[in-house]
Design a protein with these regions (language model features):
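Plant-biased, solvent-exposed loop and capping regions
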Residues: 1-739
Length: 739
């Protein structure tokens, strides 16, 4: 019985092996395809190609799937793919994330007319698309992240009646976005992604005919004109994303037709008008992003009915109204709210404390007032809080230091008459332990900088500008392991420049990639940051700004150790002495400001090696000599050097005078060079004096007989000189008389 069972198993295995055996013609075609491309070894060595990695066959042993994503494939796609035309049942072809080049010809699609899924994304393909897509079966076509260019012919989709997804994101396509995709063909289309290209003109009517369309993306183009009216007829739409264009006009009240809409992103356009009153009918809305437009009026109260909202982005518009009148408590899923730079009034809405999912709040640059309540501690996930513009806040630090998840904190125009939280006021300090950015801008904080700041081991940006902080800079700040941006400008800080700041690890050593964490934060970091400084800490240049304080003494030579700093601003202090030559070690320096101090001496020639310097200012010091010639220092405006009467040379009108027939620049530059040369002449002179003095005088002091002989010798020399001079004078008188 057992013997019969084994025979049945063996027979079944033979049958299954024969059924799935690879077709030899197709095996040869696959090997031919691989041979025309360079790649990492595919390990296609076994007899049965159906067992090869990336290959799937049907029951007849014919290849249906060829999935070679991220295999390091290189070469021209068209000659290599011609052999794939023998794969008559191939329905899925994925060659994404490789380095394939060349263009797509009509023959490419003709030879693969059974394809349903074609993914060629993230390659180096280029050229224009063919006149038409000669495939009736194609359902998904992904050409994103390549180098295609030119217009997409309206005829391209004429035969693609089963197309459901078309993605050309991140190419260089231009011209109009083809609306004919819905008018003449592809009635089943569900996804259209034209974003990050060079499409221009207006969005033509026709997309309203896409009755199945769910996702429509066309952001980061050069689109203009109004939103197409018929887009509100595409009632299946779940996502509309047209950011970073030049669209204008208003959002129609007909938007309430799009009851399936979950994502609406129209940020960074020129849209205007009032927000639709019926936003509340979009019950599935999760992401509302209307930043950087010209919307005006009130935030519709009906928006509070969109209980699935996760993010609200309305920054940089002209919206107004009492924000405290809105009831946010129903938005239990709300994670981020950004109302930066509008005209909202009222107090901080306490109903936000009920939004337990909140991670980020940015209400900067509005006209809000009021206090931060202890209830904010109920927001356990709060990591980003920016309330610049919420004026006259007091006592907030004692509350916020207990927000355990807080990473970014920005406050401004507050703390009137309030002292910095002193060390004695902090018992077993455990607050702000996750803080990465601490920013107090134009506050009225007084008192000295507390040493508890040195316990913020995760802080990367410390921005305490425009307050009334006094006393010296704590040396312990130099121990902060992650600090790379320190701004203490416009305070009343005194004392000397602490050398410990020149040992800040993130300014001295490149952070190992193995220790870097995700530097993405929830919202834009700086209140008025450019797009460059969006939401990554790594995009912010390492900075040391101590300007406009009362710091005195010399700029330490150790300043040359902070190799990674991009911006160094010590202006408006009482620094004296020479400009340290070691500043030339800061090869990444882009901004150097030493103006309005008491610095003296020459401008070091070595500063000419700072190749990335685009801002330089040493005005109003006591510098002298020539401005180094033949360097980019002379490319700066004369205002960068004014206020130094003894400074000369271009770009100043004060020319350097010649010295002893030698060109003044040459002579003075020699003086600049000699300033930094080791003073060997003085050393050797001193050594000679010491050796001569002690060689003679020392021996006279030690040995009495030598001393007696020496003075006897001097007496004899004196007598002889007296005799010779007397004889010489007598002879001269006689000659004069004889004359």
């Amino acid at each position: 019985m057992a013997h019969d069972f084994l025979l049945i198993l063996l027979f079944s295995h033979i049958i299954s092996t024969n059924v799935h055996a690879c077709n030899q013609t197709e095996r040869a075609s696959l090997l031919s395809f691989a041979s025309t491309l360079s790649s990492r070894p595919l390990n296609w060595t076994s007899v049965n190609c159906c067992h090869w990695k990336g290959i799937t066959c049907n029951k007849d042993g014919l290849v249906t799937h060829l999935l070679l994503s991220s295999k390091g494939l290189k070469g021209d796609i068209f000659p290599s793919s011609s052999s794939l035309g023998n794969l008559k049942c191939l329905t899925h072809l994925n060659l994404s994330h490789n380095s394939l080049s060349g263009s797509l010809e009509t023959e490419f699609f003709s030879s693969l007319d059974r394809l349903k899924i074609l993914d060629l994304s993230f390659n180096l393909l280029s050229g224009k698309l063919p006149f038409s897509l000669p495939s009736h079966n194609i359902q998904t076509l992904d050409l994103s992240s390549n180098r295609f260019h030119g217009a997409i012919p309206s005829s391209f989709f004429q035969q693609a009646r089963n197309l459901t997804s078309f993605n050309v994101h991140n190419n260089s396509f231009s011209g109009l976005i083809p609306s004919s995709i819905c008018l003449q063909s592809s009635p089943l289309i569900r996804l259209l992604d034209f974003s990050l290209n060079e499409f221009n003109g207006s969005i033509s009517p026709g997309f309203g005919k896409c009755s199945k369309l769910q996702v429509f993306r066309a952001g980061n183009n050069i689109l203009s004109g109004l939103l197409p009216k018929d887009i509100y007829n595409a009632t299946k739409l779940e996502e509309i994303a047209f950011p970073f264009n030049s669209l204008h006009g208003a959002i129609s009240e007909k938007i309430f037709n799009l009851t399936n809409l979950a994502i609406l992103d129209l940020s960074f356009n020129q849209l205007s008008g009032l927000l639709p009153l019926h936003f509340g009918k979009l019950s599935k809305l999760k992401l509302l992003t209307l930043d950087d437009n010209h919307f005006e009026g009130y935030l519709p109260p009906s928006l509070m009915n969109c209980t699935n909202l996760v993010e609200i982005h309305m920054a940089t518009n002209n919206l107004e109204g009492d924000i405290s009148m809105l009831n946010f408590s129903r938005l239990s899923h709300l994670s981020k709210i950004d109302l930066h730079q509008n005209h909202f009034t009222g107090t901080f809405p306490t109903s936000l404390y009920s939004c337990q999912s909140l991670k980020a709040i940015r209400f900067t640059a509005n006209n809000l007032k009021g206090q931060i309540q202890p209830e904010i501690l109920s927001l356990k996930s709060l990591s980003f809080l920016s309330l610049i513009g919420l004026t006259n806040i007091t006592g907030a630090m004692k509350i916020l230091m207990h927000c355990k998840s807080l990473q970014i904190l920005w406050l401004a125009y507050s703390f009137k008459g309030e002292e910095m939280l002193a060390d004695e006021g902090v018992v077993d300090f455990g607050g702000f332990q996750n803080l990465r950015v601490l920013g107090f801008f134009n506050c009225e904080l007084t008192g000295q900088m507390p040493s508890w700041l040195s316990k913020l081991k995760n802080v990367e940006i410390l921005f305490l500008t425009g307050s009334r902080i006094t006393g010296p800079i704590p040396r312990s700040l130099g121990t902060l392991p992650k600090l790379f941006y320190l701004s203490l400008a416009h305070n009343r800080i005194s004392g000397e420049f602490p050398k410990e700041l020149c040992r800040l690890p993130r300014l001295v050593h490149e952070e190992p990639t193995t220790t870097q964490v995700d530097d993405y934060v929830d919202l834009r970091i700086f209140p008025h940051s450019s797009l460059i400084y969006q939401q990554r800490l790594s995009s912010i240049p390492p900075t040391l700004n101590l300007s406009f304080n009362y710091i005195h003494g010399r700029v330490p030579t150790e300043i040359g150790q902070i190799h990674l700093v991009h911006n160094l601003d010590l202006s408006g202090n009482n620094f004296s002495g020479n400009i340290p030559e070691q500043i030339s070690n800061l090869k990444n320096l882009e901004k150097l400001s030493l103006s309005i101090n008491h610095l003296s001496g020459n401008i070091p020639l070595s500063l000419a090696s700072l190749n990335f310097l685009n801002y330089f200012n040493v005005s109003y010091n006591n510098l002298e000599g020539p401005i180094p010639t033949g360097t980019q220092l002379q490319s700066f405006n004369d205002s960068a050097f004014e206020g130094n009467p003894k400074l000369c040379g271009s770009p100043l009108l004060n020319e350097c005078l010649p010295i002893n027939g030698v060109d003044a620049d040459s002579k003075n530059n020699q003086g600049v060079d000699s300033e930094h040369q080791f003073p060997w002449l003085y050393i050797f002179t001193a050594l000679g004096f010491i050796v001569g003095f002690w060689g003679v005088c020392g021996s006279l002091i030690v040995k009495k007989t030598w001393r007696y002989a020496y003075f006897k010798f001097l007496e004899n020399v004196q007598d002889r000189l007296h005799v010779k001079i007397t004889v010489l004078m007598t002879m001269m008188k006689r000659r004069l008389r004889g004359a």
